[in-house]
Regions:
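Amphipathic alpha-helical polymerization modules
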Residues: 1-271
Length: 271
C-alpha cells in the first residue's frame, strides 16, 4: 500500500512537468517561429532497467522493495515542424520555407558574443545599414554563418550584413540580397546536421552544442513574410485539461491510501 503512495506521488510530479511544458507552449503561441515542446515519461520497466545507473534524486526512497516506484520524467523534446506563414508586407520580415535557421551574432548582458540560431525573421535596419534582430543583434551573412562553430562568427561586424540604408532592396529565395541591381550579401541561412546537437537557449534562440555541425540549408527565403508558432492552441488546451485530470486522479489515490492507512492504524488497532 505504501508503494502506491510513491507511485501516485511520481505521477503527480510527472503531470506538473507536463503542465509546465504546456503552459510555456501556450505562452509562446504568438511568438514568431517558436517551436513547441513536448514531454515524455518512462514506464516502470524502463525505469527499472536504468535504475542502477540513475544518479538523479527525486526524493523517492530507493530501498522500498525490489520494484521501481511510479513513473519517471523523461526528456523534453522540441517539435521542429513548420509553422504557418503570415504575409506582413514589411521588407525586413523573412520566413524560411524548409529546414534551417537564421544565424545571428548574439551579445549577452555580460557583453560576450556568440553565434545563435533562430527561426524568427523579424529584422530591422540600423542607421548605419546593418541588418539586425529586434533586439539589436547582427544578422550574419552566409560565409560567416557557415564558418561559425557556434562560438564566433569570424569578424563581426565584418560578418554582419550591411546595406545602403538609402536604397531599396530585394531578397530572392536563395537569400541573396539585391540592391541597385547588384548582389550585396546573402542571408546566413544554415542548418544543423543533427538536431540533437542544438537546444533552446531562450529569447527564441537556439544554441549549438559541442559536436554539432553547421551545414548549408535548402530552405527557401520568403521576404515580407513571417513564420508563426507551430503551437496548436486548441490541442494544447485539451492536453492541459487531460493533464489536470490526471494530476487530480493521483491526488485522490493518495487521499484514498491515506484514509486506508489511518483506518488500519486507528480503527483496526483498537480491535
Amino acid at each position: 500500500m505504501t508503494k502506491g503512495l510513491y507511485t501516485a506521488y511520481t505521477g503527480m510530479i510527472n503531470q506538473m512537468h507536463r503542465m509546465d511544458v504546456l503552459t510555456n507552449n501556450l505562452a509562446n503561441s504568438a511568438t514568431n517561429g517558436f517551436k513547441k515542446e513536448g514531454a515524455t515519461s518512462q514506464a516502470f520497466d524502463e525505469v527499472l532497467a536504468v535504475k542502477i545507473k540513475d544518479t538523479s534524486d527525486y526524493g523517492i526512497p530507493k530501498g522500498l522493495g525490489g520494484v521501481s516506484l511510479g513513473v519517471k520524467i523523461g526528456e523534453t523534446y522540441t517539435d521542429y515542424a513548420q509553422g504557418p506563414f503570415r504575409v506582413t508586407d514589411n521588407k525586413f520580415d523573412f520566413a524560411l520555407d524548409g529546414d534551417g535557421f537564421f544565424a545571428i551574432s548574439f551579445t549577452n548582458k555580460a557583453g560576450e558574443s556568440s553565434v545563435k540560431y533562430t527561426r524568427d525573421g523579424a529584422f530591422t535596419l540600423t542607421k548605419e545599414g546593418y541588418l539586425v534582430t529586434k533586439d539589436g543583434d547582427f544578422v550574419l551573412n552566409k560565409d560567416a554563418a557557415l564558418a561559425s562553430d557556434g562560438n564566433s562568427a569570424g569578424g563581426v561586424p565584418g560578418g554582419a550584413i550591411q546595406l545602403n540604408p538609402n536604397l531599396d532592396f530585394k531578397v530572392d529565395e536563395e537569400g541573396r540580397i539585391i540592391q541597385d541591381g547588384e548582389e550585396v550579401a546573402t542571408l546566413g541561412v544554415v542548418d544543423i546536421e543533427d538536431y540533437n546537437y542544438i537546444k533552446k537557449y531562450g529569447e527564441n534562440l537556439y544554441d549549438l552544442q559541442e559536436g554539432g555541425v553547421v551545414t548549408d540549408s535548402t530552405a527557401k527565403v520568403r521576404q515580407e513574410t513571417l513564420e508563426m508558432s507551430n503551437v496548436n492552441v486548441v490541442y494544447e488546451m485539451v492536453e492541459m485539461i487531460t493533464t489536470t485530470r490526471a494530476y487530480e486522479t493521483n491526488q485522490k489515490v493518495i487521499q484514498a491510501i491515506d484514509d486506508s492507512l489511518s483506518k488500519a492504524a486507528n480503527d483496526v488497532g483498537r480491535v
